[in-house]
């Protein structure tokens, strides 16, 4: 977990990733996929897939060791997460990002609002997960998400 924490922190100072409490990372540790350097055993990158509803998931907290950028680690992480989504039967994957070209290379497109029926929206309002609140674009989290782009991929 310390390695994931360090990767996240490397991108939150310039607000390229939303800051997360360490307890939140621990609560979601089973959602993470971690890329490990085979030579030295260090964590090179991470990313998580959070299922929100029967047909909807979010890719979140994708981070690569800054010294290893450009090595396609992020691409491999997102590819694995999309494969996991397919295996789970998820048909749509959401992300909230500044990296629109990166996610666009996978087929993500920009969206407005929360692409769920009102009945699902009402159920999602009951979630305590901050990422779900960000997906719903709730007023209380808007200061955290300023400048981010909402994107969706249909699998």
Task: Report each predicted region and the residues it spans.
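A generic local structural motif
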Residues: 18-21, 78-81, 137-138
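Short amphipathic alpha-helix that is part of the acyltransferase structural core
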Residues: 1-20, 36-37, 42, 147-155
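Terminal substrate-recognition subdomain of acyl/acetyltransferases
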Residues: 86-88, 92-155
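Conserved acetyl-CoA-binding loop-helix of GNAT-fold acetyltransferases
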Residues: 64, 70-85, 94-95
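A conserved beta-strand-loop-helix scaffold within acyl/acetyltransferase catalytic domains
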Residues: 15-38, 44-64
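Surface-exposed charge patches
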Residues: 6, 83, 101
């Amino acid at each position: 977990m310390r390695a994931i924490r360090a990767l996240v922190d490397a991108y939150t100072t310039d607000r390229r990733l939303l800051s997360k409490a360490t307890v939140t990372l621990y609560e979601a540790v089973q959602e993470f996929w971690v890329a490990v350097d085979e030579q030295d055993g260090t964590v090179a990158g991470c990313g998580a897939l959070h299922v929100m509803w029967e047909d909807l998931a979010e890719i979140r907290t994708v981070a690569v060791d800054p010294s290893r950028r450009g090595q396609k680690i992020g691409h491999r992480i997102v590819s694995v997460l999309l494969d996991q989504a397919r295996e789970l039967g998820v048909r749509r994957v959401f992300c909230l990002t500044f990296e629109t070209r990166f996610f666009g290379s996978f087929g993500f497109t920009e969206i407005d609002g929360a692409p769920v029926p009102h009945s699902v929206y009402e159920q999602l309002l009951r979630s305590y997960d901050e990422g779900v609140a960000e997906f719903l674009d709730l007023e209380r989290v808007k200061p955290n998400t300023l400048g981010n782009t909402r994107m969706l991929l249909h699998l």
